[in-house]
Regions:
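Short linear motifs in exposed loops
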Residues: 13-15
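Generic low-polarity alpha-helical segments
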Residues: 5, 10, 19, 62-66
């Protein structure tokens, strides 16, 4: 996927390089697991917690997506989070008019690309979520009744 930021086009790809970016994997995993576990959560706390994390989540996700083409193995224009932060800031300024210049939409765009690139499978998130959904209820292992009878001597 290509993102136009400033006067340059950046290629976003979620492949092995992104999966090796701890910040990206941590942010997307926390975000996706949080969204998957909304049941039984205080809605107000969930919304506030999610909203306060959107900027840093978007930054970590963007940084990971830039690694393949613009990191050490690419053109070397994005070598740290500070570089990605400048691009994120510029993207928000550039895209206010088209409606995608906000953290929520940026995350949506990036998650969509992650899905297309198979990123969730690469990092094991798909399998982890599937395992959580197919868990069978635990059965008690102690099926014997306790002998409460007092033995006489």
């Amino acid at each position: 996927m290509e993102l136009k930021i400033g006067n340059k086009t950046y290629n976003i790809e979620y492949s092995v390089e992104a999966s090796l970016c701890d910040d990206c994997v941590e942010k997307v995993t926390n975000f996706m697991m949080g969204m998957a576990n909304v049941d039984g959560v205080d809605a107000k706390k969930f919304v506030i917690g999610t909203m306060t994390n959107l900027p840093i989540t978007a930054l970590g996700m963007l940084y990971g997506g830039l690694m393949a083409h613009h990191g050490e193995d690419g053109d070397n224009t994005v070598t740290c989070l500070a570089d990605a932060k400048k691009l994120l800031k510029q993207y928000i300024v550039d895209h206010k008019e088209d409606g995608t210049g906000n953290y929520y939409d940026i995350i949506g765009i990036l998650i969509d690309q992650m899905g297309k690139d198979g990123f969730f499978d690469i990092i094991g998130l798909t399998k982890m979520i599937e395992m959580g959904q197919t868990k069978t209820p635990k059965k008690p292992t102690d099926h014997k009744k306790k002998n409460n009878a007092v033995t006489e001597k």
